[in-house]
Amino acid sequence: MKEKLLTLLFALIAYGSFGQDISLYQQFNGRYDFTFMGNTLNPSENNITPTCTINTSSSANLNLAPGNNIIAAYLYWAGSGTGDFDILLNGQPVTQQRNFPLSALNTDGQTRAYFSAFADVTAQVQATGNGAYTVSELDLTAWISDPLYCGIKTNFGGWAIIVFYENASLPLNQLNLYDGLEYVPTAINITLPSLNVIDNVGAK
């Protein structure tokens, strides 16, 4: 059995922080694989103009091959500030079911808040299938325009949907989904439990 892992780690450079450790959220065993899609809300590279701006929506496409049956789909979103936890996915309301707050002491000596959030959108993605997915009403404008974030290039927002699927033609796999929100100092150690890679062929 091959081992594949997926780690959702929104990383920020900082001196110290209070966040959420990376941990195992879910494991799938069988003829499974995964893909993901997502997009940023940033209209351009961070801090290239005196005033930072951000979009409140963006889109991405799902393109699964025929025969791949969706078994789970999870939406993650993240950004600067304390968070916006009620958003829309293709016009349908989505409310966070888990969230990962982070208070980071950045390199300029200022403490800033960042966040990530999670929602299970399996039913919606199964019903929609391939096509365009738009996350909207994710409004981080108040934080992005604040010089506290814009001044050190930590103004950001974005989202991703992780899609797990089954196909009888796939080899037996073990898929581990790890998530959390941590800062990245000059060095960091992250321990991933329940990970036993016996063959790196096809691992990812």
Predicted regions and their residues:
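Bacterial Sec-dependent N-terminal signal peptides
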Residues: 1-21
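Disulfide-rich extracellular domains of secreted proteins
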Residues: 19-204
